[in-house]
Amino acid sequence: MAFKDIQILRMNYLRGPNIWTYRPIIEALIDLGEMEDHPSNKIDGFNDRINGWLPGLVEHHCGVGHRGGFLTRLVGGTWMGHIMEHVSIELQLLAGARAEFGKAREISKRGIYKVVFRTEHEELGRESFLAARAIVMAAANNLAFDITATVDRLKKIADLRCLGPSTACIVDAAVERKTPFIRLTEGNLVQLGYGAKQRRIWTAETDRTSAIAESISSDKDLTKRLLTQCGIPVPEGQIVKTADEAWEAAQDIGLPVVVKPLDGNRGWGVSLDVNTEEGVRAAWTAAEKEGSEVLIERYVRGDEHRVLVVGDRVVAATRGETACITGDGISTVEQLIDSQINTDPRRGLAEGFPLDLIRLNTPRGEMSLLEIQRQGLKPESIPTQGRIVVVQRNGNLNNDVTDWVHPDVAAVATLAARVIGLDIAGIDIVTQDISRPLEETKGAIIEVNAGPGLLMHVKPAVGQPRPVGKAIVEHLFGPNESGRIPVVGIVGSQQTTELSQLVAWLLHLSGKRTGLACKDGLYMDQQHLGKSDSRGFEASERLLINRALDAAVFETTPALILDEGLAYDRCLVGIVTNMPDTTPTLIDKHDIQTSDQMRTVVRTQIDLVLPEGAAVLNADEQAVTSLAELSDGEVLFYAKTKDNATMLTHLQSGGRGVYCKEGHVTLARGDQETQLFHLDLELIARLLKNGLHISTLLAAVAAAWSLDIAPLLIRAGLKNFGQQNQHVAHTLQG
């Protein structure tokens, strides 16, 4: 029988923390239809076909907990939603992306499943899931499937949409030290941290990288002159505009020479060890295509090295290797390149490969073609048995030598970066032995590069990977800096808008420029920027990217957590006012039907509380108090009276609480109490008369106290809140 396609009822991209995980995910709702009655062990040949197309599935542990765990589930019989989850993950891994997380859960309707998996980019995730369905259906119906074409297509999406390797290793290091990040573009411009504490990177450039310094480094002649003036060894050279001038300069300098574009990069257009007039003229032609002018330099004998300088220290170094082929008397040069060089797994077309493929018939292969011609060969030539042919002299910087760098060489490299003005620089050094001073080896610095590639240090072919991303993050942030500003998140259905405005006001009075995203609009430092509902992801993110803000307050709802996820990764204070009831929309769209399911949604706010932060919970609601165990930080309860079982138990254990006692709002820590103000105080009484709930007032006090706002300032702020925020008073009245 031919099975009908599994229906994808909805695919949703959750960009921030959600009920499943902290990371961005695809959440798909699917209808298995007749496939609900046909698990994997009920379809002849299904498992063999899936495993044949995707042998990497053996590495998926699944719930079994060990290698081959998912295959065990396949053999025992598992449903197609679960299989689509794992296939989606495997396809992304094959595309070079990361996707370590996934779940598949049946909802209350038979045959309807939620399938969830992590993705680095929405387009990649969506396309992977569509491909997963196609693979599952082909396996079920015993149809052919071109897995290679599918993976190639997904690789192109990943290369285009995901972070490049240099940026990714910095972001990974930031995440490791709990520093949040936001992608500001579809490219590699990334913000590390929030608000006024943020820093920005673009590949291996930072917001400390001077535009002037970058311009200097791209002008190789100017770079050399500045380095020479500071006593740093560089090869002498001349700028030329024609092939004739190139040959004249080569004779003046003395053969052999290096011919390269004045403003080139990545070694493109560079010819080394050129020692004939014909070679110089051909090299000039190749270099002229890559830059505005051409530079002729003295050839320095030795190996090429890349030394990475971050701040004022060397953090990594690699040595280059010459790419060669060995003749067999049968194969052509081009065939030998494909069989002996391009089969190296380190080589590829995508940015994630540390080495490029060598294609003689492409513009990037022109330098290799010239190298071959200098040895009297052509692509179709057949080298004799055992003859070694050099194909590429530069650009293969992939052997780690960090531990070998002589202190004097490191000092020269860091000085070169300072002279040019770069905070992060790739210093290209030619020397016969990097473990000896350059004076002894007659070595020299040949280039200083802004925005250096980091992949060679993260994935060297030989030697130890170096934590260069970590070094860059430590350069941007001090030892005790996380890039975070105080973030307050509020969820519930009882006066959360008013509460968010109260908390933002108190933060403002404490001296922090505070942003607020709530139902009433978007506020930046008490300026009302718009009256449209600003509780969603995009409006909230506007606050986090604003360099002027020292703190931010966010109101959210269960629906927004389910539809988008939260805009921030963690919060200093998480507040839950009550456990909302479900709604027809939540039932129909998300299958949230019970109080336990609603708790799973609301707990997201408390899951995000930082260890140094606090969960502020309404002790008058038992469903809310049960969330206390989920907080990584302190728990601070508030209640209308002290005579609350949860509050009493909490105080007995030395915890903090806020409650009303004999008409006074009271702060308590253990058995110590401080009366803050009386509810009959004129301005406070007016707020309450106008509709502000006592519990909302108590929640605001508790939040402010957890933010270390002084009690006297809390009292003063609440007294004049209504007067200074007339729009809030109007909201309460009407």
Language model: regions and residue ranges:
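Extended, charge-rich helix/loop segments that form flexible
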Residues: 336-396
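Active-site nucleotide/adenylate-binding loops and adjacent lid/helix of ATP-dependent enzymes
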Residues: 44, 51, 175, 199-360, ...
